[in-house]
Each structure stands twice: as structure tokens, then as C-alpha cells.
């Protein structure tokens, strides 16, 4: 990602809950100041040390809640403080449905299923995997971490 210094400075301070690159991209998109260039602007090599692992730090359902569901909810709510558009409203509804489903609130399963278009794979995973017994859930998480699922 490349950004004009003045624009980046105008978005300060960065919130602690959000990765800085994500926050900058979100704010620029909300301002209508983002574009995609097909041709590379810099030489860049992706390697294992600079990629975030899938389900890093998740070994049980409580970890999943804290690191996947709650982090997303915090991020969406933080974004909602600086912008408003339909996709963000969908993300907020999906996030609330994820929390309701995790806590097995009445209507949580149905609400999450209705919002599946926001992220189909995660929705299906949460609808079913979170209802598995803990040993099977842990096994499923290990398969996801290894790239099998």
C-alpha cells in the first residue's frame, strides 16, 4: 500500500484495535481516495515471516471468541465511529449475529444464517464448529491451521 504522507497524517491517531494498514485503507476508502493499480509499484516478496497465520493463537472456543469474533466486532465498531455506509452496517449486523450465535442466544443461529452472504465460509464454520464438543473443535482448528480445511 502506498499513500500520500499528508493523507496518512490526517488519519492520526491510529486506534489500538486495528492494524494500521487496514485502518489507513479503510479511511481512504471511506473518503473515496483509494484505487487499485494492476502494475506493481514496488518490489515485494511474500514469505512466511510476514504473513499472519490462520487461527493464530486459537486453541479452544474461548480463544476463538476473543481472537476472531470479538476482535472483528471491536474493529467494526471502531470503523463505525469514523464512517457510515451500507457494507459497514452489514458487517455490524453480521458481527452481532456472530456474538449471539456464539453465546447461544435465542435467534442467534438464525440471525447468523441470514447474514451468511457477508462471509459464507466463516458463517458456516461458526454455525457448526462452535457446536462441536471441545476435543473435536480443537481438532478442526488444528486442521484449519495446517491448511487442510
Predicted regions and their residues:
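A structural signal for short, well-ordered beta-strand segments and their strand-loop junctions
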Residues: 2, 35-38
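A generic structural signal for short, solvent-exposed coil/turn residues
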Residues: 26-28, 36
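Conserved nucleotide-sugar donor-binding
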Residues: 1-10
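Structured helix-beta-strand junction loops
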Residues: 10, 14, 30-31
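Residues immediately flanking
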Residues: 5-6, 39, 46-48
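C-terminal subregions of glycosyltransferases and related glycan-biosynthesis enzymes
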Residues: 17-18, 22-23, 30, 43-149
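Short leucine-rich amphipathic alpha-helices used at interfaces
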Residues: 2, 28-29
Amino acid at each position: 500500500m502506498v499513500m500520500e504522507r499528508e493523507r496518512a497524517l490526517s488519519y492520526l491517531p491510529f486506534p489500538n484495535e486495528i492494524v494500521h494498514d487496514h485502518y489507513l485503507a479503510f479511511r481512504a476508502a471511506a473518503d473515496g481516495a483509494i484505487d487499485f493499480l494492476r502494475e506493481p509499484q514496488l518490489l515485494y516478496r511474500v514469505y512466511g515471516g510476514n504473513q499472519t497465520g490462520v487461527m493464530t493463537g486459537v486453541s479452544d472456543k474461548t480463544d476463538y471468541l476473543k481472537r476472531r469474533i470479538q476482535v472483528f466486532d471491536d474493529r467494526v465498531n471502531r470503523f463505525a465511529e469514523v464512517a457510515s455506509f451500507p457494507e459497514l452496517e452489514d458487517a455490524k449486523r453480521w458481527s452481532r449475529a456472530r456474538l449471539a450465535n456464539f453465546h447461544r442466544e435465542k435467534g442467534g443461529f438464525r440471525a447468523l444464517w441470514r447474514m451468511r452472504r457477508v462471509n459464507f465460509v466463516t458463517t458456516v464454520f461458526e454455525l457448526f464448529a462452535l457446536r462441536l464438543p471441545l476435543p473435536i473443535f480443537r481438532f478442526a482448528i488444528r486442521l484449519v491451521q495446517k491448511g487442510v480445511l
